Amino acid sequence: MESVAYIVVLTMALAVLFFAIAFREPPRIQK
């Protein structure tokens, strides 16, 4: 079960990075 927790932590880290970049730069992708 350690692998599951590791994947969850990685996913959360990627989400934090994505949101940090998305909110730092002006929104260009709008559909």
UniProtKB/Swiss-Prot annotation:
Pfam families: PsbT. It is found in: Cellular thylakoid membrane. One of its GO terms (cellular component) is plasma membrane-derived thylakoid membrane. It comes from the Bacteria. GO terms for biological process: photosynthesis. PSII is composed of 1 copy each of membrane proteins PsbA, PsbB, PsbC, PsbD, PsbE, PsbF, PsbH, PsbI, PsbJ, PsbK, PsbL, PsbM, PsbT, PsbX, PsbY, PsbZ, Psb30/Ycf12, peripheral proteins PsbO, CyanoQ (PsbQ), PsbU, PsbV and a large number of cofactors. It forms dimeric complexes. Belongs to the PsbT family. PANTHER family: PHOTOSYSTEM II REACTION CENTER PROTEIN T, PTHR36411. This is Photosystem II reaction center protein T.
